[in-house]
Amino acid sequence: SIENIKYIFACKDYVRFRMTGEAYAERTDYSGSGLLNLHTGEYDEHILELFGIGALNDALPPLRNATDICGYVSAEAARKTGLKAGTPVAGGMFDINACALSASVAAPEHVCMVAGTWSINEFIRPEPVTDGRVLMNSLFCIPGWYLIEESSATSAGNLAWYLRNLAQKSDDIYTEINKETASISPADSCPIFLPFIMASNVHPNAKGSFIGINAYHTRAHIVRSIYEGIA
């Protein structure tokens, strides 16, 4: 029950809690949850009340920045993990922050594109975009910057669905499907694949589909159409 909730953690913050015994929430991750005021970087009580979870305010851990030291590896965690006791543990960051940082996004003219389960395009700017043109604003791990994200579930999750349900089993499945895809020329007429098997943030009724399948199309054509639909 709600009364038994001690802390509300993001995944990495829970792992850090188990490593250190210290309960903290990290700002970039929590800003992506919609629970923070992006201008103050603190929990927004109005939003919590709007969501009907105002009573959980006390379960939200104190906020820290990505580079803050949030504790040290405990003796118990050291025994279980092999890490050295006393090792400092930083706050960490939102996964898409980590993607942008590792791609050297450090100025507004830099763009990071992620082809994971989701298709994510992101950049940073000194102010959030507030006119509704983008999917999400969150705090960037570099103070004073916001991470601007446009994304949808239209990337490699589609390929994973195909491999899980339709592809022939293989010990090296990705090499096999890459060979199949390469066997079809870009000039060939492939079906059109709409990559909305997990719906779309553009239209709630959008669904995934193959359009234009003919009798001469092979599995290789289908796989290539998935690649092209994602791209």
Language-model region placement:
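Active-site core segments that coordinate phosphate-bearing ligands/cofactors
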Residues: 1-24, 34-54, 69-231
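A conserved helix-loop-beta module that forms one wall/lid of the active-site cleft
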Residues: 52-65
